[in-house]
From Swiss-Prot:
The modification N6-carboxylysine is found at residue 220. The keyword Magnesium applies. It comes from Xanthomonas axonopodis pv. citri (strain 306). Pfam families: Mur_ligase, Mur_ligase_C, Mur_ligase_M. Keywords: ATP-binding, Cell cycle, Cell division, Cell shape, Cell wall biogenesis/degradation, Cytoplasm, Ligase, Magnesium, Nucleotide-binding, Peptidoglycan synthesis. Meso-2,6-diaminopimelate binds at residues 384, 408-411, 459, 463. InterPro entries: Mur-like_cat_sf, Mur_ligase_C, Mur_ligase_C_dom_sf, Mur_ligase_cen, Mur_ligase_N, MurE/MurF_N, UDP-N-AcMur-Glu-dNH2Pim_ligase. This is UDP-N-acetylmuramoyl-L-alanyl-D-glutamate--2,6-diaminopimelate ligase. PANTHER family: MUR LIGASE FAMILY MEMBER (PTHR23135), UDP-N-ACETYLMURAMOYL-L-ALANYL-D-GLUTAMATE--2,6-DIAMINOPIMELATE LIGASE MURE HOMOLOG, CHLOROPLASTIC (PTHR23135:SF4).
Amino acid sequence: MSRSMALSQLLPDVALTHDVQVSGLVMDSRAVRPGDAFVAIAGFGAHGLGFVEQARANGAAAVLFEPPAPDGLPVPADAIAVPGLRARLGVMADQFHGRPSQAMRMVGVTGTNGKTSTVQLLAQALTLLGTPTGTLGTLGVGLYGAAVPTGFTTPLVLPTHALLAQLRDDGAQAVAMEVSSHALDQGRVDAVHFDVAVFTNLTRDHLDYHGDMAQYGAAKAKLFARAGLKAAVVNLDDAFGHTLFAALDPALRAIGVSSRAHADASVSAQALQLDHNGINFALNIRGQVHPVHSPLLGRFNVDNLLAVAGALWAMEFAPAQIASVLGQLQPIHGRMNRLGGAHGAPLVVVDYAHTPDALEQALSSLRSHAQDRLICVFGCGGERDTGKRPQMAAIAELKADVAIVTDDNPRGEDGDAIVADILRGFARPDAAIVQRDRAAAIHQAIGMASPSDIVLIAGKGHEPYQEVAGVRHAFDDALVAAQALLPRTVLGVRP
């Protein structure tokens, strides 16, 4: 739906020499369309004032900037100086798009691991319960099942409001949204109205950005102190979650979830059993107990299901409805996806686990399903937290029977250097298999596996590419694994 608004409505406190109708608010000069207002602020490596000519050539109707302008960058005579521009972008975008987040039931999910799975499972559940639901996160934006990639876990603030408006216009009545620590720290969700906030867990990640765990946790906690929030769903089995829960505003509806019998939990999983068919437990919501039989794989998916249950209860669904829909939820692409496991082929699991905690959870969960060996293929991304590389090696050595180290997304970093960092975490590095070619590593793992083994391919999950030296090459772990499994499935023997 096309929109336009007078600039004076968006900037009532700014003296304008002339008023214009603008058809959008855009920070990327390449994305400017005729009639847009170009927002020229400091970016990650450059300032928007350096791209005014390109924005003008693309039809920008106005140029906004935050004074003072950097030295050496000319300011067009008709550019509009807006004090505190960056801080008010969320409010401006919210107003321009007609306050889309207030027109839908908004659930924000934050945490180190489980954000994507929780968002996708919640959207799937709400859709099954008759509520058209949009998703916004790692897998993209769109109504459930029709997401289009954005390239961000949480987009920048102007696109975030535009995408929410798109979901509203497409008929979404609810939105499940991943809210990263970067987004909370950088104001990407400024002026987004959330009804329910969900916390999954806090483990080591992004310390290259936040510096330490205290600052990382403080960034996550910002979601739970937002004006207008009605309910908070918190994993009480996580140490930081327990602290966060105790500090919640008493005016909030606080819903603690636990699969480990935490006394303060109002939503819990009891009598938990994992088998080759999935997960079985009794869902207890404030004393109302209903059985859940889920086809999902892995102990941590119990936590994801409880997060979904807590969010649904916060949205006033009945416990019986919640238990029923949990059992209908199907796996998310790239999150503990199952391949093989029949006709002489080993069970192969593709998962996005790319942090120490996520890898440990994936391996520990699969150990409870394994009849024989657990083979792990993993690597670490380039230009990211180097401290987690030896940690992931130690976990793979401890939790798997065979560890194969390979390339993840080296990006602009030397792959041999990444592998060297990883190998430092092995007590016996000579026992690790190094095969930097990821496709070859996957074929090697599946080729050595017996029918009773489990192969975990960790790190990339849903990603359809591998980034090497700044170039994204087509690559899909699940597709490569399926190709490697084909001779096993057809012949029923090892190739």
